[in-house]
């Protein structure tokens, strides 16, 4: 029920690309251009400056985008409120998740959530923690899932699940048979790290600093944009790297990588749900938030002696939100 021309403008403004916008809107590119032109005529203001293949928002366009996003959110909230009167959870839900969460946690949460609420349409984007926080603040998503806290006053962080970062080496690496190394040895070996802005990198740097090791003293051989890339690099013998315990279950079982304990270094963090500071969200976003907090309680993990995550067998069957909340109350 969102005003159609305003929706076309909003999608173009967010993509800054008419071709991408046309694909998202399932319209031809000329139809997108025509709708934008008609809106500009109606308002008497130019909304975009077009220079060759580049599109930028004018001051009027930037101003309108703020209100277009607000209008879209308000209309979606209205539809969700009406659905709630019928006892349904329905509507669109836009999420952003950091890469580790998107790969290893979000799929299991979404799979169960959609079984219970099949009328919800979910769209999700992924990036590093910094990008997820930006998407939330800019209003492009309703909720975010990240590694660690957001560290912003305008963002509320809620813990979902504990994670541990472990150092891994290839099975034929000299450290594989030792199993344990000292911090001084870590400084001598090529290290594969996530890119700046990543929650994984930040938590590793903070832990190393607390242990008296500065990042500048390490031999950072490569900076990579995903956990999978680090695992693959380690398997190929390019160095060692810190990754989430969730990322290496298969590789440890296959024997391609080995977790290495570092004396005096224990890197623990939280996977967290983030939302704008203020009242708890309602509608579809509120339903997902409550479900996610309850779901991760019901499927919490423990680790074996290798630091590999193992699911608690007492919670293999997914619980409904009401059942999980009842269980939480009993355990208090």
List each model region and its residues.
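A short LG(V/I)-centered, amphipathic sequence patch enriched
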Residues: 40-57, 62
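Central regulatory/effector-binding core of bacterial HTH transcription factors
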Residues: 90-153, 224
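A late-sequence structural motif
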Residues: 105, 258-302
């Amino acid at each position: 029920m969102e005003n159609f021309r305003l929706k076309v403008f909003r999608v173009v403004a967010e993509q800054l690309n008419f071709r991408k916008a046309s694909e998202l809107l399932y319209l031809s590119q000329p139809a997108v251009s025509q709708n934008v032109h008609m809106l500009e005529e109606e308002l008497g203001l130019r909304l975009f400056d077009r220079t060759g293949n580049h599109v930028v928002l004018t001051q009027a366009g930037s101003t309108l985008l703020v209100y277009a996003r607000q209008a879209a959110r308000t209309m979606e909230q209205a539809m969700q409120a009406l659905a709630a009167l019928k006892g349904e959870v329905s509507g669109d839900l836009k999420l952003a998740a950091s890469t580790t969460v998107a790969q290893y946690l979000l799929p299991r949460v979404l799979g169960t959530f959609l079984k219970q609420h099949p009328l919800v349409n979910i769209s999700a984007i992924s990036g590093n923690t910094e990008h997820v926080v930006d998407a939330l603040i800019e209003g492009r998503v309703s909720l975010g899932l990240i590694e660690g806290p957001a560290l912003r006053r305008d963002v509320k962080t809620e813990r979902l699940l504990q994670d541990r970062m472990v150092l891994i080496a290839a099975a034929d690496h000299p450290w594989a048979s030792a199993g344990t190394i000292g911090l001084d040895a870590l400084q001598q070996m090529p290290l594969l790290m996530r890119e700046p802005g990543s929650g994984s990198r930040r938590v590793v740097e903070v832990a190393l600093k607390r242990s008296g090791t500065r990042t500048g003293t390490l031999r950072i051989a490569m900076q990579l944009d995903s956990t999978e890339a680090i695992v693959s690099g380690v398997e190929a013998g390019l160095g060692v790297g810190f990754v989430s315990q969730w990322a290496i279950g298969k590789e440890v079982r296959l024997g391609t990588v080995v977790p290495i304990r570092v004396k005096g270094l224990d890197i623990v963090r939280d996977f967290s749900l983030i939302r704008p500071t203020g009242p708890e969200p309602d509608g579809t976003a509120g339903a997902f938030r409550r479900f996610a907090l309850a779901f991760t309680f019901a499927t919490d993990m423990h680790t074996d002696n290798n630091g590999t995550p193992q699911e608690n067998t007492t919670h293999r069957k997914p619980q409904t939100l009401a059942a999980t909340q009842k269980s939480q109350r009993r355990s208090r």
